[in-house]
Design a protein with these regions (language model features):
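Ligand-binding loop in jelly-roll beta-barrel domains
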Residues: 2-26
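Histidine- and acidic-residue-rich, metal-dependent catalytic cores
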Residues: 36-230
Length: 230
């Protein structure tokens, strides 16, 4: 069976968490010059996004494990790939837009709205439609207010809902240069209260995992704040 432990692999001086014995991740290793290399480029452009990818992977797999009975049509490998590479499309966003502290101009927001599409496009060729759609839909919201397609609840699969919660949770609990950092408990409770946007069951599961210590802040965190990013 697949290990439940998520070991740490060093890529340069940045930690990327991944499941070493999953076939999907052995496949990723074979394409180090493409997807892994793009993550390295993202690290050079925007360190927050790189670290964020590893955190979203960790949280998404914890949620997957807790909700495994509902994930019969979704493999843990596919969830892991979609979570790790959900933001890989950001490699096409100019750094001045990623790190801009003030409101973006309409001509600039198109880059932000585009990145899930680029992530899906880059993943589809190597990992198939299911992984691509999951990554592409992580900014969709249940009430149709998300992007890039403005999908409604019935059109957003559970894997994408899980990554959406994991993505928002990490953004709320990590300093990005312009935000107030929330505690893990505060962030999880707030997400439970946003059930018009995020899946209630996923958010409630996250809160349970925070309360029981399955998801907790690492003892050794970097103390220097990251540059602001989208």
């Amino acid at each position: 069976g697949l290990t439940r432990e998520i070991p740490v692999k060093m890529l340069g001086d940045t930690r990327i968490l991944y499941v070493t014995n999953c076939p999907a991740f052995e496949s990723v290793a074979q394409f180090e010059e493409s997807l892994i290399a793009l993550l390295v480029k993202i690290n050079e452009k925007d360190h927050y996004t790189y670290k964020h990818s590893g955190s979203v992977l960790k949280y998404a797999l914890c949620l997957y494990d807790a909700m495994e009975s509902q994930m019969e049509h979704v493999s843990r490998n596919d969830m892991a790939v979609a979570a790790l590479f959900h933001d890989v499309g950001k490699c096409f966003i100019p750094v001045e837009i990623l790190q801009k502290p003030e409101a973006l101009e309409p001509s600039e927001t198109r880059y932000i709205f585009r990145h899930p599409i680029d992530s899906g496009r880059m993943l589809r060729a190597e990992f198939g439609d299911a992984v691509a759609e999951t990554a592409m839909n992580h900014h969709e919201r249940l009430d149709g207010s998300g992007y890039p397609k403005g999908l409604m609840a019935e059109d957003i699969g559970l894997p994408a809902r899980i990554i959406a919660v994991a993505d928002a949770f990490d953004a709320m609990t990590t300093y990005r240069g312009y935000n107030k950092v929330k505690s893990f408990e505060e962030a999880a409770e707030e997400l439970v209260g946003l059930c018009d946007l995020f899946d209630c069951q996923v958010a409630e599961t996250l809160l349970q995992l925070v309360n029981n210590g399955t998801i907790k802040k690492e003892e050794k965190e970097e103390t220097e704040p990251d540059e602001q990013t989208r």
